[in-house]
Amino acid sequence: MIAYIEGRVAEVTEQSCVVVTQGGVGYEVHLPSHLLARLPEQGAAVSFYIHTVVREDALELYGFSGWDERQTFLVLISISKVGAKTALAVLSLYRPDDLRRIVADDDVTALTRVSGIGKKSAQHILLELKYKLKVESLPASAGLAAGVPGSVLRDAVQALGNLGYAEEEAAPVLKNILKQDPDLDVSEALRAALKALAKAR
């Protein structure tokens, strides 16, 4: 399962871009509009956190600027009748912190501004998010809010565990990274750890 990708921009469409990795393989990555709008020129380096959607007739990659945004996407697609395209439309209009405020304010109208979401669907999504966002307690947000290295370490180890890395493998790498740069947030620490772990393997 692809969870992170680095490469160079080969092509850009209205909803996606093609990222060519160092090995010469090109992947089409669907992106929220805020990422598409600030993509660099062709040939420039990019990196995204990825969620892979496997269907009977296709394998689709969805890319995000950080771990928090990726986790928010997963929460959204766990809601009944919310598919990947709708979840991406939500994140094209609202960032994760915006979405949390919408849930806290019980703002149904804000969700109806998303293309394809009517009032009834917005009410259903909001109800589900009240439960799911609280239960999930999205890790990157907690790390950023706390600003505590210990919290960053804990949340990054948990995120790597979700990607299949054992704690005894991930924790020493992260401790070393955070020792060198204690000001890193969860997303930055996770990115550095993934690079280090990939080299080690």
From Swiss-Prot:
One of its GO terms (cellular component) is Holliday junction helicase complex. Residues 1-65 are annotated as: Domain I. Residues 66-143 are annotated as: Domain II. It is found in: Cytoplasm. Keywords: Cytoplasm, DNA damage, DNA recombination, DNA repair, DNA-binding. One of its GO terms (molecular function) is four-way junction helicase activity. Residues 143-147 are annotated as: Flexible linker. GO terms for biological process: DNA recombination; DNA repair. The keyword DNA-binding applies. Residues 148-201 are annotated as: Domain III. Coiled coil: none annotated. InterPro entries: DNA_helicase_Holl-junc_RuvA_I (IPR013849), NA-bd_OB-fold (IPR012340), RuvA (IPR000085), RuvA_2-like (IPR010994), RuvA_C (IPR011114), RuvA_C_sf (IPR036267). NCBIfam families: ruvA. Has three domains with a flexible linker between the domains II and III and assumes an 'L' shape. Domain III is highly mobile and contacts RuvB. Belongs to the RuvA family. Homotetramer. Forms an RuvA(8)-RuvB(12)-Holliday junction (HJ) complex. HJ DNA is sandwiched between 2 RuvA tetramers; dsDNA enters through RuvA and exits via RuvB. An RuvB hexamer assembles on each DNA strand where it exits the tetramer. Each RuvB hexamer is contacted by two RuvA subunits (via domain III) on 2 adjacent RuvB subunits; this complex drives branch migration. In the full resolvosome a probable DNA-RuvA(4)-RuvB(12)-RuvC(2) complex forms which resolves the HJ. The RuvA-RuvB-RuvC complex processes Holliday junction (HJ) DNA during genetic recombination and DNA repair, while the RuvA-RuvB complex plays an important role in the rescue of blocked DNA replication forks via replication fork reversal (RFR). RuvA specifically binds to HJ cruciform DNA, conferring on it an open structure. The RuvB hexamer acts as an ATP-dependent pump, pulling dsDNA into and through the RuvAB complex. HJ branch migration allows RuvC to scan DNA until it finds its consensus sequence, where it cleaves and resolves the cruciform DNA. This is Holliday junction branch migration complex subunit RuvA. It comes from Oleidesulfovibrio alaskensis (strain ATCC BAA-1058 / DSM 17464 / G20) (Desulfovibrio alaskensis).
